[in-house]
Amino acid sequence: MANGSGKPKPAFFIAVLVVVAGLVGIAFYRWNAKKAETAQSVGSGKIDMGSIKQQAGGGSGSSQAENPDPNSITTVKEYAFEPASRLPEVPGTADYAALGKPRVVKFAVNVWAGWAPIIWANQGSKPKKMWKDGKGGEFQVELVLADNPVDMGNTFAAGKVHIGWATVDMLPLVVNRMSRDPRTMPRVFQQIDWSNGGDGIVVRESIKSVSDLRGKNVVLAQNSPSHYFLLNMLLNGGVQPSEVHMDFTKDAFQAAAAFNQDKKYSAVVSWSPDIYNLTKTGMGNRMLVSTQTANRLIADVWFARADFARDNPEIIEGLVRGILEADEDLKTDASKQAVGKLMDEFYSLPAGPGLTMLGDAHWTNYAENRDFFLNQNNPTNFERTYNTAFLLYKAIRSVDTKVPFDQIMDFSVIKKLGSEPRFAEQKNEYEFKFTPTTGLDVNVESAVLTKTVTINFFPNSFDLHKQIPAKSGTGEVPYDPNVDYTIEEIAKLAGQFGAARIQISGHTDASMRGVADESLVRELSTRRANAVKEELVNKYKMNPNQFVVAGYGWDKPADPKDPDNHAKNRRVEIKVVPAEAQ
């Protein structure tokens, strides 16, 4: 493409420019795509807890903020699939220690109150008592103490124990290690308990809220329930993990010792009894939050090797049934005294601590297990807890590839036992009993667990779903388009923090200051707060006594530096206040 003088024609330069522009465009596109990928990749940029919660909620990959399912989140909607249709096939011959004659199942546990039911069912740790399997055959159980989860995992993978223990938040880490051999992949059959005060964050007296941990040193055990607990508290409180300096120890007990010895640590995440020893009078420490408040956050479960579960379904049924029956037996004081002594002996404790630690966990009965495994709409079910843990650990680069929840969760035995009246008639007993209170009774400002959630209102309105003319001129749109999502998020928080008060405070703008009657202004703000409470109680069947409602009129602008921002001031604020502050 040249003219008579041998020089390129103008069209040549145009073509070159087009090619160069195209190459630059491709490079720019790929750079932006890489940048976006990096921003969303694990461990880089800010971690968005709201996004994690949306993805964890039984997600289908939809870009919608809410599940289009018309049922409310507390409506019982059970999974329609059968576990066998989702669980991967287990190839090859078994690779675990032979059971022998009589059959002896080796069941790993750690030093924890949650294992009281199986210790009671087995009458100690030794294989003495005869259990009945699903077909009436006999077997025995040997409880193996394995406190270190890494060592326990190695023993489990080697086939030296048939049953392992974990909290659901640990499972993404467990399956990440076990996925190389499908025979060792965990099959989770039963929830043992909810941590109910046994895990906690202890801080120095100067730390008043989660946000005060910014820039501070925290000591804890890495990739443990303590780690998951802290990540949840930080992100729900609006603090990025990168804003906190974390030092890791081998286990929670070493973390407590480090906190006690070194004043550079402003907080420690540990568990009972250390969290209570550290908060004794005169030590200068306090409990920021424990699973007494976040009482549906840490769930203990047991799991079998996939090859063992394949070969011994009747033993699995016998274990589930025996533990559930022991839950019922342990409701008497006499049985609690007796199991406390068995725990002292098994855990090599002096006389007494076994009984004392029983209150650290709530043993889950049949109804609570069914709700945990089968109720798709339960905001704190197995699926959501597992997915949330995976996404949190992926965000800090502890895991990469996800194993779907339904490839490790097997609710077949729980579902089968529902045909027996003694189980089917059980009720969920894990409900916190709130006493009515007022906004002035709760010290909200001193200890708020989560960042403040806000809903905005139209002038002179307390209608949550107020419609206004669309800017396009056609039809109407919600004044606050996020209100339904916000209400659902509050319901999820209230579920996780089952023993926390939910403070709902209503506010107005000050545009009529000096003109309007102040009592009318305060009444409007109170009505706004009550509208939020009523929506939660009516839509999600929540305990009305969990909510503390107050109307502040125009006394508390959203931003004291910008008190005349009327649109921001017409609002309701929702805060989660721990039981420890009540």
Model-derived segments and spans:
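Second-shell loop/turn segments in exported
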Residues: 105-106, 142, 215-220, 264, ...
